[in-house]
A protein has these predicted regions:
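Right-hand nucleic-acid polymerase module
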Residues: 188-249
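Short, charged surface segments at domain edges that flank catalytic/cofactor-binding sites
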Residues: 299-342, 366, 370
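A conserved non-catalytic segment of reverse transcriptases
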Residues: 51, 60, 136-202, 206-211
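Histidine-centered nuclease catalytic patch
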Residues: 344-374
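A glycine-rich phosphate-binding loop feature that marks nucleotide/adenosyl-phosphate handling sites
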Residues: 104-108, 144-154, 203-207, 224-232, ...
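Extended C-terminal regions of large enzymes
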Residues: 228-320
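Conserved polymerase palm-domain catalytic core
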Residues: 1-154, 338
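Glycine- and acidic
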Residues: 20-21, 63-71, 109-115, 189-190, ...
Length: 374
């Protein structure tokens, strides 16, 4: 979605006005009758999904409308329900491309934006069409949260802020997303004031790593450094509070280590169950590389053998981005004695090469080293 936003808004001739769509209670209000009548799937299974309800505190709550709260199938059903929005806009405004209306839709599940050449056109023509489309499905746009914004003022979408600065489009983590992330970390640290350092690191790392990976395709390096500083301040207060009678120097040496050029790494050594000493180190968001996302082709199907070569190429490029991926490719290279599996010539950094699966993923293969070759 971020790559699509960049594609439709980054050029000088791109639309300057954006309709930010917000569906009021999307998952709660989708019409069961509409889904049963229109979704192309087994109706018996669909009815069971819709009527499954949910269990909270050992009590069953039936689902009379919408999709089951928290169910893994709910986003899929919502996505299928909204799947015709782009087609509807293309039919309703079939001449938009030739008349300079600059109509584009970017949608991810129930979050979407629609671009246009003017605020009035989006308000008076596009918005009513969207309202009509949603009404058929039992949905309505939120009057308060649905708004039309100029790209120069920017807008928030999926946790990012999209805005043009002097004609240059930048996509950054939004202030609201950063604040929510720090609030979550702060609450976790405050709830574990007496927890062992290794345990706290184990609780924080998945959150830090997941958030940083989510924003690793946008302009986020400066934000990553700011988040690292904020997390350091939280952990410093956590450490000082635990030892009110110790000096600050003692606290620093107890909880923060020197690693390379970094002198304040939240880290510790602990003995694991097998008797071996293991080092636990807090993840730094700033260590996450910023890599531009390569959009997948719309028609690509990972289950179709005809697309195997395309997905092999994408997979190989992703492997080169991470240290774990490069290490796996290195093990494959060593397994083959540093030579190509086909021509047996040496594979070096100066020779063109690519990786592939011996048993294709579409045929049940895995990403294990034993199933890879260069």
């Amino acid at each position: 979605a971020a790559a699509q936003c960049f594609g439709v808004l980054s050029r000088k001739v791109s639309a300057e006005w954006v309709l930010e769509g917000d569906i009021q209670g999307c998952f709660d209000n989708i019409s069961h009758d509409w889904m049963i009548a229109n979704l192309p799937m087994d109706k018996v299974i669909l009815r069971k999904w819709l009527k499954a309800g949910y269990v909270y505190q050992s009590k069953l709550f039936p689902s009379l409308s919408g999709t089951p709260q928290g169910g893994i199938i709910s986003p899929v059903l919502a996505n299928m329900t909204l799947d015709g929005l782009e087609t509807m806009l293309a039919k309703r405004f079939s001449n938009a491309k030739w008349t300079g209306k600059k109509l584009q839709l970017v949608r991810y599940a129930d979050d979407f934006i629609i671009t246009g050449y003017s605020k009035e056109w989006l308000e008076n023509e596009v918005r009513p069409a969207v309202v009509e489309f949603l009404a058929q499905r039992g949905l309505v746009l939120s009057q308060e949260k649905t708004k039309i914004t100029h790209i120069g003022n920017g807008f928030d979408f999926l946790g990012w802020n999209v805005r043009k600065y002097n004609g240059k489009l930048l996509i950054k983590p939004s202030k609201a997303n950063i604040s929510a992330h720090l609030d979550k970390l702060r609450a976790l640290i405050n709830a574990n004031k007496a927890t062992r350092q290794a345990t706290l690191i184990g609780l924080l790392n998945p959150i830090l790593r997941g958030w940083a990976n989510y924003h690793s395709h946008v302009v986020a390096k400066k934000v990553f450094n700011q988040v690292d500083n904020a997390v350091w301040e939280m952990l410093w207060r956590w450490a000082v509070r635990r030892h009110p009678r110790k000096t600050l120097r003692w606290v620093k040496d107890r909880y923060f280590k020197v690693q390379g050029a970094r002198r304040w790494v939240f880290s510790c050594d602990e003995q694991s169950a097998d008797g071996r000493k293991r080092q636990y180190t807090l993840v730094s968001a700033s260590d996450t590389p910023i890599v531009r996302h390569i959009k997948i082709k719309a028609a690509a199907n990972p289950h179709d053998p005809a697309w195997d070569e395309y997905f092999e190429s994408r997979w190989g490029k992703r492997m080169l981005v991470s240290a774990k991926g490069r290490a796996k490719l290195y093990r494959v290279w060593l397994k083959q004695g540093g030579r190509c599996c086909a021509c047996l010539k040496p594979v070096t950094k100066d020779t063109p090469w690519h990786s592939r699966h011996i048993v294709k993923l579409s045929h049940g293969g895995t990403d294990a080293v034993a199933n890879l070759e260069i």
